[in-house]
Amino acid sequence: MTKQTLTQLEQHDLFLRRHIGPDSSQQQEMLNYVGAESLDDLTAQIVPESIRLSQELSIGDSCGEAEGIAYIRGLAKQNQVFKSYIGMGYYGTQVPNVILRNVFENPGWYTAYTPYQPEIAQGRLEAILNFQQVSMDLTGLDLASASLLDEATAAAEAMALAKRVSKAKKANIFFVADDVFPQTLDVVKTRAECFGFEVVVGPAHEAVNHELFGALFQYSNRFGQITDFTDLFAELRAKNVIVTVAADIMALVLLKSPGAMGADVVFGSAQRFGVPMGFGGPHAAFFVARDEHKRSMPGRIIGVSKDTRGNRALRMAMQTREQHIRREKANSNICTAQILLANMASFYAVFHGPQGLKTIASRINRFTDILAAGLQAKGVSLVNNTWFDTISIKGLDVAAVNARALAAEMNLRFDADGIVGVSLDETTIRTDIEALFDVILGAGHGLDVAALDAQIVAQGSQSIPASLVRQDAILSHPTFNRYQSETEMMRYIKRLESKDLALNYSMISLGSCTMKLNAAVEMIPVSWPEFANMHPFCPLDQAKGYTQLIEELSSWLVNVTGYDAVCIQPNSGAQGEYAGLLAIRKYHESRGEAHRNICLIPQSAHGTNPASAQLAGMQVVVTACDKQGNVDLEDLKAKAAEVAENLSCIMITYPSTHGVYEESIREICNIVHQHGGQVYLDGANMNAQVGLTSPGFIGADVSHLNLHKTFAIPHGGGGPGMGPIGVKAHLAPFVAGHVVVKPGRESDNNGAVSAAPYGSAGILPISWMYIKLLGSNGLKKSTQTALLNANYVMKKLSEHYPVLFRGRNDRVAHECIIDLRPIKEASGVTEMDIAKRLNDYGFHAPTMSFPVAGTLMIEPTESESKVELDRFIDAMVSIRAEIAKVEAGEWPADNNPLHNAPHTMADIMDPAFDSRPYSREVAVFPSAAVRTNKFWPTVNRIDDVYGDRNLFCACVPLSDYE
């Protein structure tokens, strides 16, 4: 028996060995194949010596899963979860357990990617379509998006849309009613400054006194008042003002819709439809507009089309509006949204149905009526005389009330003007009302909830005026009326899940997306009530666990990036880009150089880069790339010199979007710095840097980090994401602040970029666990294994497909690009054909046509085993053999397994299949691996053009699914 030390038996590196796909013997086999002696040797061959770190990370040692869970459990226990009545867009909710277990905690839902391959994403596309239907029904408008990041950023998007579509072309003022949530106004002001818009804040009725392109109103407002805006909206629209409304999704169940009042755009948070507060997120925002504004909508929209068999099929509609195509001309930089949370909200609506939602909303309103009636009976004065769930109280001894509230472990809202706010929610019960009476009035008030309820039933309630009571039906589609039993709901969720391919089935090799393992142990703390049920505006001394977690995570990210400070607030990668560029903008302004507004961006950049630069008020100048995919230094020098006086920054990705470590990266940074600019290094490819090099060491000034790529937060089928930024010391004073919660930085007075001070804080435990469990050595080894896997795949495939770009020593970084243009020229087979054929082999396609048209970009990540890599390689080799048959004329160019892919059960059941020049087995069982574990696409190839020409973005008849 081999003698082992106690340290070896304790297996502190067990998580590392389970996170990394290839075991030690597989790694050595792969190293031998690619021609390297060790991971360190391979690293030395790939990463330029000039940027290689000489010191190890100082994160600490790796630890076991049980140890990590115990540590983070200790942090969770430091959070005091008081009963929250703060409101302001964040409310307690009861997540149906059938949704919690089968969606939120299910890798079939949380590990999928954005549905760019709709044929293998019909399940979540249907769930998202349901979300759009809920949004349209409740707002009374025509077309909904497939979620935005939060209510405040949706408000900023609404302002931008208003400017795009308003006929008041000379107007430059956006009006914001003075009773909107303060965090919303904060984010709107930040965005308006970049666009050069003037924001005027005042009482709602004063909007007509200004020459506006748009206006924003809150329904109900932050004090709880609900107002019929019908006449005001008509007057504004007559003046070509685009009317936007921030609305409460639960209140809309009972209230007259903003669309019925004449609103053009309605948005808000869907959080209270079964999504925990999570100390600020993640939550999905809904965004709905009139049909006439559809081409100006931000974000993804799911639409109905048809497949090649003529069957209804779903896919993302009108993608030509979006950043990955339109770049700086896009409507928005929105990319990763909040699809997992939108799906949870849509399932919440499906599970409760219209009657269940009305019961919940009516109960909330009734409890608010009872609370108001009891207080008024005791002579307490209210600010508002109408309400759905919120009352605002004046004339109280604020200090005494606050002391009693804290003693009772509840949080009320205390405004600076002495007003005390109370917002009720789905979790409110009778004893809560009794406790509120005790806190607000003191003991011995003598009020009885049952008696007050009887009084309201007898006399009727006027809290919602008759003119504001919803008269039209909602959620009449059968989907919202047939799954109210848990058995049916469980099966509906499973039926949709089975239509989608996620990481729990096979690898997803999307280049630039880093679809690595989202380990179960990392996910577990997210559901804990100590993290899930915290209000983002609670007193910070109640959130000591969150505070310590954020501080530790931030310090680790500082160490990993080589920067001096981190701002956690941005709640997506695109939002991080925007936040980083804002820091650069404010830095230049502080130096009296506000004229510096030109952003240099290489041709190969992600589409979000130019879109974000445009949002930050910058002018984009594109720099060329050479034939090897590197930044053309001579072109960069010329353009930097040409615009030197106005140069703000460069945005560059490293390793490059071509999948190589550019040797000249430090020279690129120096060129920009010499001309007074800053270097923004896009963190999309950070998975190839951690432990080997860093943006700060390279010479960059600011980066965003995709925690949903490099640091293991799952993609959720299109969100959530987190995009914190790291900055050098000179930019630290200019990162995002927050008007409600002061993070305690020099930047407190800066505007916010997200609604919550720490963004989607509820998912930060995932990245914390990832880093804690791996430790310094594990993080580095993960990066090195990602390089090994990519080079193994590249070398294997290079025998069958040309590899477009390689770096030093004929190596790639963490991803490789195969060039399919010669194949297309020789055979007519396109990258789309190959992508769809991969579905038949049980794989999601790699990234198509980015950064070069006619290519596939493959990123295997460190989490995939050699067995899975070989299965993917075998599929690609088999597909190349199929292409050869087309090239040889054995199969017609318009009738072969690639052209007809993907294949469905309907295909092989069709007698007409006999006329095809290939067998049913070739169609659906093209490999031995598929025969033992088959994934069935449920639709054939989808006609995108038909869908956009016949735009339909609502629930379709159930008969279309039968």
From Swiss-Prot:
Reactions accelerated catalytically: N(6)-[(R)-lipoyl]-L-lysyl-[glycine-cleavage complex H protein] + glycine + H(+) = N(6)-[(R)-S(8)-aminomethyldihydrolipoyl]-L-lysyl-[glycine-cleavage complex H protein] + CO2
Example GO molecular function: glycine dehydrogenase (decarboxylating) activity
Keywords: Oxidoreductase, Pyridoxal phosphate
SUPFAM superfamilies xrefs: PLP-dependent transferases
Keyword Oxidoreductase among UniProt keywords: yes
GO cellular component: cytosol; glycine cleavage complex
Named cofactor requirement(s): pyridoxal 5'-phosphate
The enzyme's E.C. designation: 1.4.4.2
Disulfide bond positions: none
Superkingdom: Bacteria
Chloroplast as UniProt keyword: no
Subunit structure: The glycine cleavage system is composed of four proteins: P, T, L and H.
Homology family: Belongs to the GcvP family.
HAMAP family, sorted: GcvP (MF_00711)
Cited function: The glycine cleavage system catalyzes the degradation of glycine. The P protein binds the alpha-amino group of glycine through its pyridoxal phosphate cofactor; CO(2) is released and the remaining methylamine moiety is then transferred to the lipoamide cofactor of the H protein.
Protein name: Glycine dehydrogenase (decarboxylating)
